[in-house]
Regions:
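Beta-propeller and closely related beta-sheet repeat lectin domains
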Residues: 66-69, 142-147, 200-204, 267-270, ...
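N-terminal secretory signal peptides
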Residues: 1-12, 21-31, 36-39
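Short glycine-biased active-site loop of nucleotidyltransferases that positions the nucleotide triphosphate
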Residues: 324
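Short, well-ordered alpha-helical packing segments
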Residues: 22, 67-71, 175
């Protein structure tokens, strides 16, 4: 790969991780990449369109971006939260994170189209602003969105505060919006970086029908398995209300110390209730792919749960619909069904920064 073009004077842990995954995928070859928990032979996969970032054209001052975590807003639109974003290219001008765009798309099969930006003053600007102010400096390297959820008329965004370098988590925190994501306020809740032995840094969540929000958590370094928490939906801002699921005295129970419910090397995750089931999608850093599980409940035995590979990693210049170079993310777009799933998937060509974008994938036939 070519010499790195850095976005700051500090090292890029995410770049190192993605480069490692790409090398591993190339070294394993097609046979290893195909040895996932379940082959995706029954799936129909379509690369729909690049939504934002490189290869999408500049929209709302966004020329390079990743993640695109989607949520349904209280007013019925879609909101997509993005991570590190620049006006032109990685390491370029107007670095900000998180930013968010709106979509009124109702037919996902036609492709998501953005029609507005979130953030204070966004409706009077042509540039999507950082959702809240902080300086990208020696203390706050950057703040990355982890997941977004809507509970009633309020939205919550979990964010990962990095510093002094990317991948070193100072803490994570909870923000809220009462105007469908137009403006955001800090709830006052900060989660310690070492909560659950570092397994509550990158999280995903879904609202159950029992009054609880269920949360899978892992580290931000792609070297840990996942733990499970729950919190009453009306107590989101109270740290003491977050209950771990753990194994002790011969059994699993809420309130036991958090125990990994599945080992591995987890990256970005997306947990959602869908079609009477629960679905978890995640970037499997160990296998260089995006996997999925369909569950009856988040407390299912994940060791024995069926797992399906949705997308494999691949090499630049040798991609197809199911083999995607330097992929990560894999977030479920509202409006999906288990049999017709739409995901936002990120790519970053860490060798030359020519690709740093979010793409929409359609996956049919999972169930």
């Amino acid at each position: 790969m070519s010499e790195e073009v850095v976005r700051s004077a500090r090292p890029l842990t995410r770049r190192t991780v993605l480069q490692g995954a790409l090398v591993a995928g190339a070294a394993f070859g097609a046979s290893a990449l195909g040895s996932s928990p379940a082959a995706a032979a029954g799936l129909t996969v379509t690369r729909m369109k690049v939504l934002a970032g490189t290869q999408a054209g500049v929209q709302y001052g966004i020329g390079a971006t990743d993640l695109g975590i989607p949520a349904r807003t209280p007013d019925g639109r879609l909101l997509f939260a993005f991570g590190d974003t620049w006006a032109d290219a990685v390491g370029g001008t107007n670095w900000r994170s998180p930013v968010a765009l709106y979509s009124s798309t109702t037919n996902l099969a036609a492709g998501v189209v953005f029609n507005g930006a979130a953030g204070a003053g966004a409706n009077t600007q042509v540039t999507a602003p950082q959702l809240w102010y902080y300086p990208h400096d020696a203390y706050y390297e950057t703040v990355i969105p982890s997941d977004v959820i809507t509970i009633g008329s309020r939205m919550y965004l979990h964010a990962i505060v990095n510093g002094p370098t990317f991948g070193t988590v100072r803490w994570t925190e909870l923000w809220q919006s009462d105007d469908s994501g137009a403006t955001w306020q800090h709830t006052g809740l900060k989660f310690p970086a070492d909560m659950a032995d570092g397994h509550f840094q990158c999280i995903t969540w879904g609202q159950g029908n029992d009054g609880y929000v269920y949360i899978y958590g892992t580290g931000f370094q792609r070297d840990k398995g996942i733990v499970l928490y729950r919190v009453p939906q009306n107590s989101m801002t109270s740290l003491s209300a977050y209950q771990p699921w753990g194994y002790a005295n011969g059994g699993w129970a809420w309130g036991n110390p958090a125990t990994e419910v599945l080992p591995g090397k987890f990256g970005e995750m997306c947990l959602r209730p869908l079609g009477g089931k629960w679905i978890l999608t995640w970037f499997n850093a160990d296998g260089y792919r995006i996997d999925a599980m369909v569950l009856n409940t988040p407390t299912d035995n994940l060791y024995t749960a069926a797992k399906t590979t949705l997308l494999w990693g691949g090499n630049w210049g040798a991609e197809d619909a199911t083999h995607v170079a330097q992929l990560y993310g894999g977030y479920i777009i509202p409006g999906s069904t288990l049999s017709d799933l739409h995901l936002t998937v990120s790519q970053w060509n860490t060798g030359n920064n020519s690709v740093y974008h979010v793409e929409q994938f359609r996956i049919q036939g999972l169930v």
